Each structure stands twice: as C-alpha cells, then as structure tokens.
Amino acid sequence: MHESHEKHLFEVYASASGRKLGEGMGMLRDIIIADSDEEARQLWVDSATFAGNAWFVPFGFRRGMLDPETGEAPTAEEAIAKGYALVGTVDTVTRSLEALKRKLPVNWLFAWTHNTLVPHAKLMRSIELFTTKVLPRAG
C-alpha cells in the first residue's frame, strides 16, 4: 500500500483489534537476493512485472499502491527504495529490512519469492542467503 496510507491504516486496525501498534502485525514483501544489486533488480523486475500484471492488476490490487496526489504507481526503483520490495545483495537487503523495521512495527514477514518465475537455482540461492545471512543480521 502507498506509504501515505500505512500509518493511518495500521493505527485503525490496531485500535479495532485492541492491540498495540505492531503487535501481531505481519507484512508481505517481495524478496530477491543476488550477487549484485543489478542482478537482483533484473530478476525482480522480470518476475514481479509478470506476476503483478497477470495476478494482481486485473483485480485492482495496484490501486493501493498509487500515489494519491499523482495517480502514478511507483517505478521499480521507487518500490525498492521505499522498501515495498527487498531486492539486492545481502548487505542491501539487510539495510532495507532494518529500515523497514524502524519505519513499521512488524512481528513477522512473509517472503514472496516468485516461485517458478525466478530461475530455480537463483531462487534457491536467494532463499538461502535470506535465511542464513540477512535474517541473522536483521531478523
């Protein structure tokens, strides 16, 4: 969802559920880790573009990502920079996850990895790096 809506909606749902902000809250983020930021970005763009356009846009999911002032969806670079997708090297993704945790209180993270859309060996390596390198540092 666009960042302009995040805090308000999180506060509304926390209040409605009788919980503290962030308590029991999870989020889904695309996660792709590769040897370079450029490789990870390309893997993400290739897989997320297909998945988004085929599986989410037809059902209206993109509307929540639109900038309320411009009506524009974030570019790939903006999505990564804002933490909507955790994409890059181990160091880049670790920094992104740490920044995301400072910004949004969450208890758990669902790692959307675009199974079958990312070449299998690269996907397995990405998951391995996330679980063995990123999570121990930023988890």
Which residues fall in each region the model found?
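Active-site-adjacent structural elements that line small-molecule/cofactor binding pockets in enzymes
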Residues: 1-139
